[in-house]
């Protein structure tokens, strides 16, 4: 899998599969419309959407563009909570556990450019001591500790055990489904798989590039905010030097960004980055040596419109 975030550029293409998909609770015969990406839990007044504990199914048609002939094609999910099973024309092609990390499925051996297929995604929101987040299906209280005799805890256990509804032993609502974007992606067959940048305040930028394919020249360039080159190196790993670097800071008007441009054969990838130092001294959090105060922390990334 490529760990790089998808992008459209001169060598890469992507198609967003977001929109209205078919949806049903596993075991039902009828399909109904659902928005993707989004948690399904709040998309209907039907209590089953909020209370579901178990598997649901999504379905839609996908087509590989004919113009992608000769390119590597893959299907990328940015997140499906909490475990996923992916099927193409009814055949399992991938599984994944964990609802907060992306995963990809190579399509070259499964579909030809110009071909259409039926994509099905099974999502399961049940969590236990082997999943992230860790939880239990109503057997114990928050964080796995058992607190007998507390009425609310005992009622929650009974509700989960008797009705199988979505009340796992965690301290947040268990939003689930295809929660982040789904895309079809095309890259050259020899492509940039990953890149790492470690900038320092003195202008040094340590870099490493991981590629898929035969060895070939790799060009790494750094462009300033105006798009002008300020450093370059032909190597798979090394150190770039930026003279008189501009620092990234979170204050208005100061978040200066450079762009690292990597070229490998026919592939190209650009990654914005900033030069800054983060340090903790006693009770002070420092960015580039200046104190920074945090305001309004949020424990969970819940949205009243989209869920998680």
Regions found by a protein language model. Give the residues of each.
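Secreted/periplasmic carbohydrate-active enzymes, especially glycoside hydrolases
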Residues: 1-308
């Amino acid at each position: 899998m490529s760990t790089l975030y998808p992008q459209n550029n001169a060598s890469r293409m992507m198609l967003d599969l977001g929109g209205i998909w078919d949806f049903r609770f596993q075991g039902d015969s009828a399909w109904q419309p659902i928005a993707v990406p989004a948690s399904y839990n709040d998309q209907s007044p039907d209590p089953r959407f909020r209370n579901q504990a178990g598997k649901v199914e999504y379905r839609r048609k996908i087509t590989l563009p004919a113009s992608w002939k000769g390119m590597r094609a893959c299907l990328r999910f940015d997140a499906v909570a909490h475990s996923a099973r992916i099927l193409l024309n009814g055949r399992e092609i991938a599984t994944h556990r964990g609802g907060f990390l992306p995963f990809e499925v190579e399509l070259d051996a499964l579909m030809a450019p110009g071909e259409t297929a039926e994509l099905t995604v099974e999502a399961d929101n049940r969590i236990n001591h082997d999943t992230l987040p860790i939880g239990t299906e109503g057997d114990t209280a928050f964080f796995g500790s058992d607190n007998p005799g507390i009425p609310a805890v005992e009622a929650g256990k009974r509700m989960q055990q008797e009705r199988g509804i979505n009340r796992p032993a965690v301290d947040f609502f268990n939003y689930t489904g295809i929660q982040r974007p789904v895309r079809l992606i095309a890259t050259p067959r020899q492509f940039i798989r990953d890149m790492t940048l470690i900038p320092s305040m003195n202008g040094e930028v340590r870099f490493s590039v991981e590629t898929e394919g035969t060895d070939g020249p790799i060009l790494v360039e750094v462009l300033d905010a105006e798009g002008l080159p300020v450093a370059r190196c032909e190597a798979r790993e090394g150190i770039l030097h930026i003279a008189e670097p501009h620092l990234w800071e979170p204050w208005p008007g100061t978040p200066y960004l450079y762009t690292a441009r990597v070229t490998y054969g026919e592939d190209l990838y650009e990654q914005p980055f900033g030069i800054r130092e983060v340090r903790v001294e006693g009770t002070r959090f420092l960015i580039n040596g200046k104190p920074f105060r945090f305001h309004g922390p949020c424990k969970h990334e819940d949205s009243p419109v989209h869920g998680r």
